[in-house]
Amino acid sequence: MTSASSAVVPEPTTVTPQLLAQHSITAEEYDRILAALGRTPSLTELGIYSVMWSEHCSYKSSRVHLKRLPTKSDRVVQGPGENAGIIDVGDGWACAFKIESHNHPSYIEPFQGAATGVGGILRDIFTMGARPLAVMDSLRFGPISASDSTDPDQKVKERELHKNHAIVEGVVSGIAGYGNCFGVPNLGGETKFEPCYSGNPLVNAFALGLVRKDEIFYGKASGTGNPVIYVGAKTGRDGIHGATMASEEFKEGSEQKRPNVQVGDPFMEKLLLEACLEAMQTGAIVGIQDMGAAGLTCSTCEMGARGGVGLDVKLDLVPQRETGMTAYEIMLSESQERMLLVAENGRELEVLRVFAKWGLDAVIVGVVQPHPRLRIFHHGQLVADIPNQSLTDDAPLYHRPVGTWKTPFPHDPPAEALAGLGKDRDYLADLKKLLASSNICSKRWIHEQYDSMVQTNTVQGPGGEAGVMRIKGTGTLGHERGLAMALDGNGRWAYLDPKLGAMHAVAEAARKVACTGATPVAATNCLNFGNPEKPEIMAQFSAAIDGIAEACTALGTPITGGNVSLYNETRGEGIYPTPVLGIVGILEDATKAVPASFQR
């Protein structure tokens, strides 16, 4: 590899307004790229900046607001900024948990979008050294019954219902297919239907795992000369620019973006889990990072930035399942079930042997360098040479205009809403109509597709208010500690009052956990909103942050991490502001968990 002091620079590309538009880079952002590099970028460098500065990866519109959230308590071991948050649950054990969105991919390709959403959140958990213990999901779809649809055009209504049915079936099958094959219990969650989600479903996946408190791993590179090892599935062309796609609203033709959606393999992920946990036990791993959004690009620059070091990577060594892949394609591919790790120099064979045992690719593709730069080589040529900080901490940060949110309805019901009430009204018919609603009727038809008992830790599965798992090896035999977990969100309430609606989401998730007998101790959030370039949307977002902060502070449940999903709009029509909260609580004795059903 060329030395860090070499005058060789990547070959510049011809940058046009059309090329910048294709990469969703503004003229102002391109000026920042020129300033960071001191020259015209190569095409590979432009692609790297495109994904790392996307809303999905950089949080450039939301970071200024997220700072207002409470993130610390005596139980918090790791807060926001890592692959997952971690809390201390006692007896030397810690719990890693997080919620993430996979909304845009699940609209374009429902099965794979939802499946890879589950796969991605599971990797976030075991990247920390934790074995996944449970998953849950919070889902939002358009109407699936004619009575719930509001479109007056019968033909449009029929097309909408047909499309929504296909999305629901694909998403639920994807979640079940991945989780069941991987071997992690699904404890349910919540599913709601509203017309505003017809063109933009929400698929928020939550996962939780256990790790010994002294065996936690972090996504940080260190140690000059340490080898950088690529492990897992081979790299293909699937998912290229997936992070950029997730940072845009849907327009006509968005369904043609199927190549941007990743393809998952739960059996490969199961092998990757076991191999990673076994390799961690060797003591030879210095740092490890999932190749999630932005793939190899994100994992290399984030590991380097966290450690204040650089990485030199040779793309010719990256295992590839397709021929003729360019450096641009390899760096931006979001092929699933892949990890990047840094091993101690001289102990790399210990790590490689573990992955060979599990039948997985494991290849040394680079080395840690003292210079804080990401340098990429392909066919012997330097194709990218970028300061790590310019991709991460120095990414654009926008103070978007925050408008004034006005409730869309009067606080008091109009007179006509009360006119039909009285003793002559058929209230039994009203009750039957309510019970038939997709939002009220049983969701058993969904959660019965999920395996909720695998691993034999489940105390309370789907169908109740919260899931409960026992923590083997804690407490006393037969009276182990337990973890309770619940998800909650109400877009309608947040639409009427973003701050109060967000507070209700926190409070209801905490109540669900408390109803099992557990003490709520920490939270994770998934913030689903529309286009942040609209002041009224930022008004919703800012108010929701204030509501979450106030409620979490009052309840003593700090935010340990989460996800922001913006641009949830289709043809200019946004979803309801939908903050979803995941709350985790601790039970001193899992056998004393209180079920949701009557017992006597």
Residues covered by each model-derived region:
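Glycine/proline-enriched, intrinsically flexible loops and inter-domain linkers
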Residues: 2-600
